[in-house]
Amino acid sequence: MFGENSRDIGVLSKEGLFDKLEIGIASDITIRDKWSCGEIKKPETINYRTFKPEKGGLFCEKIFGPTKDWECCCGKYKKIKHKGIVCDRCGVEVTLSKVRRERMAHIELAVPIVHIWFFKTTPSRIGNVLGMTASDLERVIYYEEYVVIDPGKTDLTKKQLLNDAQYREVVEKWGKDAFVAKMGGEAIYDLLKSEDLQSLLKDLKERLRKTKSQQARMKLAKRLKIIEGFVSSSNHPEWMVLKNIPVVPPDLRPLVPLDGGRFATSDLNDLYRRVINRNNRLKAILRLKTPEVIVRNEKRMLQEAVDALFDNGRHGHPVMGAGNRPLKSLSEMLKGKNGRFRQNLLGKRVDYSGRSVIIVGPELKFNQCGLPKEMALELFEPFIIKRLKDQGSVYTIRSAKKMIQRGAPEVWDVLEEIIKGHPVLLNRAPTLHRLGIQAFEPVLIEGKAIRIHPLVCAAFNADFDGDQMAVHVPLSVEAQLEAKVLMMAPDNIFLPSSGKPVAIPSKDMTLGLYYLMADPTYFPEEHGGKTKIFKDEIEVLRALNNGGFIDDVFGDRRDETGRGIHIHEKIKVRIDGQIIETTPGRVLFNRIVPKELGFQNYSMPSKRISELILQCYKKVGLEATVRFLDDLKDLGFIQATKAAISMGLKDVRIPDIKSHILKDAYDKVAIVKKQYDDGIITEGERHSKTISIWTEVSEQLSDALYVEISKQTRSKHNPLFLMIDSGARGNKSQLKQLGALRGLMAKPNGAIIESPITSNFREGLTVLEYSISSHGARKGLADTALKTADSGYLTRRLVDVAQDVIITEKDCGTLNHIEISAIGQGSEELLPLKDRIYGRTVAEDVYQPGDKSRLLAQSGDVLNSVQAEAIDDAGIETIKIRSTLTCESPRGVCAKCYGLNLANGRLIGMGEAVGIIAAQSIGEPGTQLTMRTFHLGGIAATSSTPEIITNSDGILVYMDLRVVLGQEGHNLVLNKKGALHVVGDEGRTLNEYKKLLSTKSIESLEVFPVELGVKILVADGTPVSQGQRIAEVELHNIPIICDKPGFIKYEDLVEGISTEKVVNKNTGLVELIVKQHRGELHPQIAIYDDADLSELVGTYAIPSGAIISVEEGQRVDPGMLLARLPRGAIKTKDITGGLPRVAELVEARKPEDAADIAKIDGVVDFKGIQKNKRILVVCDEMTGMEEEHLIPLTKHLIVQRGDSVIKGQQLTDGLVVPHEILEICGVRELQKYLVNEVQEVYRLQGVDINDKHIEIIVRQMLQKVRITDPGDTTLLFGEDVNKKEFYEENRRTEEDGGKPAQAVPVLLGITKASLGTESFISAASFQDTTRVLTDAACCSKTDYLLGFKENVIMGHMIPGGTGFETHKRIKQYLEKEQEDLVFDFVSETECVC
């Protein structure tokens, strides 16, 4: 267990150090002779009169040691001078009482007892070794049936079960001595002892080789793995049956006296007492030669008592304690949040800490925090005492403490001295990312609240409505140094998740800066004056200070001489030799801007401030940026105070056009209602159309209101507009509710209530409207409570799966790469290429397109912002970069594949815990978003547009589109995978454009992907102009359109079975709807060329839920609607849908309504119907290869006969199953899919997370392979092994001339991947504790303590950051040098002597 140690942990003694930890099954001899200090024979705990432990009982002092330090039980020996003496009267050793936390005892069992973990935990270890089922084992263990151990000369077989009647029959027939059959633990013990594992292993391997059935092979491989575990370890199978039970030290299961003479005891004592009582009773019964039936019952009861002790409730009913509560067994002590692992080993209480309410400290510098004097006195007490003793002010610790309590003046002086340069750590719970703990220089303050700098609030997610924070004091020099160098607030001004600044002025500061930098509103020419010209900035500032400034509201504030200047006045000033037109406010602002950034001459909303801070960091470094941030904070607060912006009711201006727009909307809703009444549209469509109308109204009014408040009036700026436009407070959605209308509201289930709230908050809501509002508000609060827990659990799983991913080397030298491009939606670019490639390593040289002489980036370069921008500007669409997904480091990842550390813009350092950073980056916004749901107040936010409008002039070209001319004269799209391209007018023919686009020889100005049923308003090849409507999208239905003329015939549309006629209650009209059915019917509409139905022209499958729009025998023309499938009511999008989606992706779950995807490239065809499923065939015309897909008739197809599809393309509606992408398209495509899908969820919420974080999680999900053919290796069929282990084993086998194993990549969800980690300590502390430990013990697994969690649990320094091996090597080298110096010094002295 203890290996040669290379760790330097400082605090632990050298004997306490170890490099690895091995777990195994303890033998009876180990329990009795090595662990135990004596046998417990009595169930008594303490004497009721003396309250002293009973001799031989569960708290016996003779076995466990004395209850008082250096004092034996009878009092003969007291004091330390008798150390180590064993009292001759009471037998107690004189030692420290803390040995009662270490010394164990044992209970000698009357009969062998089966350990419930090895029998009940799936897969059953005992069952697998013996080849018996769990139910058979249970009947034997609990004394219901006999099992044959040795059949002798009888016709019985080994391991055959016999009930009482059969047993008596066999005894009568063959005699009692002719065979051996037993019950209970004894029988299992004998069977396990007699099992020849080597021959069993051979036999299983042989059977595995011969078996062809996949299922049987999987079963055999699982059993083989367990047997191999026993063979390769020093464990004996019979050790799974206990003859002795270890007893936990008494101080770990204490008995505590309460008031009133009662005692509180650990549940374990009750459980042990039951075992001892039953064991003693059984021993007595066995001595008395009691009837077999009573003995058997007693043995079963003992087995149950031991089961309850190890795992209460695993077998039968749990043992209850007082108040009908199940007793906590040893398993419960380890499991779950309050178990030993998570409660005591991974989360400990910390001394030298305190907590208090926080308040804002605008006077603080960025690296400071205000610490209440009383708190500091308590926290730094030991330091103060030492300093007081060193000064000679006091001589004992007691007198120093008294002096501190008195609050003597010298104490305060000493405290001031001590805290200089001694940082403290501040933490706010929940600590969702590493910025939740930062270090500050403490500043002593009066009062009892901690003060924090306004700019660190965002990182802590803190506000001052009663939030509390904890303070921790780093004690050792190393800890102080680490806090100073790595954790100080100025070192943490960027988010590790995206590299964006987190320390940005907000609220009042933003408002003050925006006000200062606002566009000129005072033009002297309009007031009969001239534009003032100043020779430099100082002159402007002097004018400002001398004359005061002219206020927006109070007009001029000039001095007696009439001098003065308006803060927003248009002036001219000479700066750096140039005359610039600006405002005095901007001159004032530029006084604090570093000169390298140039003169900032534009308004300053919060987004621009953020960009300025980033720019500042890149140009002038951290120190100057931090100074700039402090100056921004001060200036912002001063200007906000001076501007005194406040909001009045009149500032909320209701748009004049409101009543007109509302009247219009009501008219449109009435038309839709009439269409419904006439039976033209369905209830679902009516609902959807109504919602679309109100959404549009909502947007119109919102825009009108924003324009209204942005107009300047007599007092120049509307305060409401200032607040929103600056980004200080509020947004357009909230403004809309204040002054336009509240709009559509959502029900708690997400469905939108179709009657909107047309009032706004300025007008006031009616009672009904208020009642509707409460829906949304309540949903928000309920969501917050429920989803926070979900998000926290997701973060925990992510941390667990990625915790051991650290930077282990500079460069792994891989040639692998991934390709990335900009992300767009239609013609809109959501994420430019430069943002995606910044900070990544280029995998191959990047040249200017068409100019090989101009190198933009060299292979191996880590791209900075300048290079990234140059590549983007050069028009390069895709670029090959290195990624953690393709990194070949044997453990962890390399710095080059990871790229820059986003928190500081430098290459990531060695030992950096990138896995945990990744998990926090993904988990933190999830929690934030769930907490923020209610800010929308349940306002319906539907994101879909009913029309496509072009933003450029050019020629419209249809690409990959099948269209048919509709009845209105417009083209209707018949296939799904096509697009409309707008290309520059170069005077070519349409065919030339199409050819150039297909070969990517020309760039499109815009691309609009279109789907089935889109109505294109412009013909192919027609010129279009900016702002022109080119297509209409059907939002409410998926249409099924006819593309050939002919006559209709219904096929399998049988009323009452596959269809039903529904009478519309309002109109009385009958609608034919296809319903779900279980028969052999396959509803479709066939089209024949004439009324006699002689020749079939085409068939159209009709999915369930569709409404048929044509009648049988009717003549139809191309473009006519045959049927329509309502899209259902639109639900609001919210991260509440998003978080489960992220969990579904990272857990690699199969989505509920999964889509079918094409397995090969080819053309779609249909081949009839079989067992309620449509046979869809994809045929590759080049190779003639065909792939069949059986698709349920209820599923909606998104491809049609004759469509070309590519491998991996969706054939039906729904979400894709990730495992299928892996199987069909391979690992690279799956990685791309998972990264993009997770990003999609966060992007919808406007959350920015760098791809590299998601890539690390995906890498962890794909780190295993599944063995398909073990070859000559020791690997097993169907086993999931680490890629590293797989390649290593294959290399060894090939060197020995054997056949290597074959494997396929396997995708594991994060929970499964966490449990499959190499470290059993880490896995056990995550989930399934008992199963993980049982598994590890059977195979005698060794934990090499390579990850973080296992080292924290063992109390070692973590192998990351400053604890990384490189750092440790430096430390050891320095220590060795010191030793050599000492040795040299000693030698020299000896020579002198």
From Swiss-Prot:
One example GO MF annotation: zinc ion binding
GO BP, one annotated term: DNA-templated transcription
Keyword terms of this UniProt record: DNA-directed RNA polymerase, Magnesium, Metal-binding, Nucleotidyltransferase, Transcription, Transferase, Zinc
List of residues binding Zn(2+) 2: 812, 887, 894, 897
Cofactor: Mg(2+); Zn(2+)
E.C. no: 2.7.7.6
One matching Pfam family: RNA_pol_Rpb1_4
Entry-linked InterPro entries: DNA-dir_RpoC_beta_prime (IPR045867), DNA-dir_RpoC_beta_prime_bact (IPR012754), RNA_pol_asu (IPR000722), RNA_pol_N (IPR006592), RNA_pol_Rpb1_1 (IPR007080), RNA_pol_Rpb1_3 (IPR007066), RNA_pol_Rpb1_3_sf (IPR042102), RNA_pol_Rpb1_4 (IPR007083)
Positions contributing to Mg(2+) binding: 463, 465, 467
GO cellular component: DNA-directed RNA polymerase complex
Gene3D superfamilies (alphabetical): 1.10.132.30, 1.10.150.390, 1.10.1790.20, 1.10.40.90, 2.40.40.20, 2.40.50.100, RNA polymerase II, clamp domain, RNA polymerase Rpb1, domain 3
Highest rank taxon of the organism: Bacteria
HAMAP family: RNApol_bact_RpoC
Family the entry assigns: Belongs to the RNA polymerase beta' chain family.
Quaternary structure annotation from Swiss-Prot or TrEMBL: The RNAP catalytic core consists of 2 alpha, 1 beta, 1 beta' and 1 omega subunit. When a sigma factor is associated with the core the holoenzyme is formed, which can initiate transcription.
Summary of the function given for this chain in its UniProt record: DNA-dependent RNA polymerase catalyzes the transcription of DNA into RNA using the four ribonucleoside triphosphates as substrates.
Protein's name in the database: DNA-directed RNA polymerase subunit beta'
Annotated organism of origin: Chlamydia pneumoniae
Encoding gene, per UniProt annotation: rpoC
